[in-house]
Amino acid sequence: MRIDTVNVLLEALPYIKEFYGKTFVIKFGGSAMKQENAKKAFIQDIILLKYTGIKPIIVHGGGPAISQMMKDLGIEPVFKNGHRVTDEKTMEIVEMVLVGKINKEIVMNLNLHGGRAVGICGKDSKLIVAEKETKHGDIGYVGKVKKVNPEILHALIENDYIPVIAPVGIGEDGHSYNINADTAAAEIAKSLMAEKLILLTDVDGVLKGDKLISTLTPDEAEELIRDGTVTGGMIPKVECAVSAVRGGVGAVHIINGGLEHAILLEIFSRKGIGTMIKELEG
């Protein structure tokens, strides 16, 4: 047992050295938010990353909690082509749940476990300037990222804080916009030239049949979309990953957030447990 523990630490050591002082943007969502054990493990992982000298930044989702709050208030959620139709009343609920509830719960748990977390949203310091998303027709106050102003994030991480970001952006029209958390995380990672973007999902990574693909280049990832290997909800995640890598992010990891300590297992081990997308070295 003791030798096993030593071996785990020795395996992690070169990665701890390599990533010391580097910025990781982590999208927290899916199973990791719904399962209590996974939620607790996520908090522990973030604290451990921080204590090994990594600078973690969290971007979180919260779709199921938004739908539940709407139902509790007697409002039936409406979806169009898989996207939430967000009228003014729905946007108020989105902001209330993401910014006022989920964000503060994550911040509280990080701080209770020895972190120094600060909760913000994309409206703070105009972190995320948004514009209306029209690709899927008019679905209300659903936005896409027009610009990221990362100065507030630099200020927080340079002063040893862990930023926790709710993906609600501000439009130049003064409206709040609900932004997909994967997209927000990718754009923030690009603005910071982050070492890594980690997307927590409900599956083990990119699959070919039932087999996990451990590593991909952006070109290979795009080919898997074209040939139909990557389908459904994994398509936008892979597209986010490709965009991030081509935008200067060192690597993107798509991993199963329902697996306890998934982040540590992916980052600090040779084999990893998910899919890593990065450019070929050299």
Swiss-Prot record:
Q: Which reaction does it catalyse?
A: N-acetyl-L-glutamate + ATP = N-acetyl-L-glutamyl 5-phosphate + ADP
Give site residues, Transition state stabilizer: 27, 237
One cellular component term from this protein's GO annotations in UniProt = cytoplasm
Q: What is its main location?
A: cytoplasm
Keyword list, A-Z: Amino-acid biosynthesis, Arginine biosynthesis, ATP-binding, Cytoplasm, Kinase, Nucleotide-binding, Transferase
* InterPro entries associated with the record: AceGlu_kinase-like_sf, AcgluKinase_fam, ArgB, Asp/Glu/Uridylate_kinase, Glu/AcGlu_kinase, NAGK-C
This one is known as Acetylglutamate kinase
Organism annotation: Thermotoga sp. (strain RQ2)
In the UniProt record, the gene name given for this protein reads argB
